[in-house]
Every structure is written in C-alpha cells, then in structure tokens.
C-alpha cells in the first residue's frame, strides 16, 4: 500500500472519481480563511500550468479557479463580469496588443501635457 500526500484544493467530483478507480482518499472541508488561501495556491498552480502549455484546458481551469476566488471573496460572477466590462470600457481591453515601451513626461507651463492620441504613437514591436 502506498499513500501519496497532496494537500491541495480539488474540484468537487475528484473524490468520487478517485473512489470509482478503486482507490480511497481523505478529504476535509475548509473554513473560509483556509479555503481562500488554498484558492490562491490553486490560482498559482493553474497559472503555471497554463503558462507551460498554453492549452485551452488549462485556460479553462484558470477561469474556474478565478470564479471560485470571486465567490470566496463574496462576489458573484455577475459582479466580476460587471467590473471587467467597466474596466474595459474605461481603459480598454487587450484587443489591440499594445506594449507600453516608455512614457515621456512633458511639462509645459507647470502642467503635464498629454501625448496625442491616435495611431501615430503605435509602431510594430521588434
């Protein structure tokens, strides 16, 4: 008999899947503080797996853990989507693939001037 120790957050059906394979497992239900800590650890784990594979499966896992983190903090998925949409409206999304290279602070009469907005400030990244 061998025992492998995990001590990590798993999806809800994992214990049943393990038992249906003829193995047994020990699980416990976490309190709020411990759950949030394990969700944070799971976010790091899933992000690392996504960064290594760039697979849609790992991206979906990451999304699932983000949803769990939102719920653990008392937010609904609608709350998360509302804030995401507000930020996208106010600051944009990442659709244009812009890489900020540098910022020049131009001072004119004691006031910070704004750079012109438009396509002329966008160039290809080499």
What are these regions (language model features)?
Residues 1-126:
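Flexible "arm" and connector segments at domain edges
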């Amino acid at each position: 008999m061998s025992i492998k120790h995990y001590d990590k957050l798993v999806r809800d059906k994992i214990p049943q899947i393990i038992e249906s394979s003829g193995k047994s497992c020990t699980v416990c239900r976490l309190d709020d503080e411990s759950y949030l800590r394990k969700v944070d650890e799971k976010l790091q784990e899933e992000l690392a797996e996504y960064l290594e594979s760039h697979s849609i499966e790992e991206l979906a896992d990451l999304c699932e853990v983000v949803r769990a983190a939102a719920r653990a903090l008392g937010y609904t998925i609608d709350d998360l989507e509302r804030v995401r949409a507000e930020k996208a409206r106010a600051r944009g999304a990442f659709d244009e693939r812009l890489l900020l290279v540098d910022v020049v602070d131009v001072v004119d009469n004691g006031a910070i001037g704004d750079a012109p907005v438009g396509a002329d400030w966008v160039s290809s990244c080499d």
